[in-house]
């Protein structure tokens, strides 16, 4: 079997991907609602534990192939999240 697993392909990616951090939330219900709002608007979003405050969960939108892709959609992303500014982060699965 010469078909590589998806994990091995992802591990071999040699270019950067980017995500847009829209916030960190303490309520699991809020995290679910925010992720659903992005999904309803055609943007993939996911959650991960907040690194500096273990009681919070960070919501990230993406991944995007470039920072410019995020900047192009930033006004819409901010509106969906109800924020004025998020953070563009280099993402490595």
Regions inferred by a protein language model and the residue ranges of each:
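Conserved beta3-strand ATP-binding lysine motif
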Residues: 23
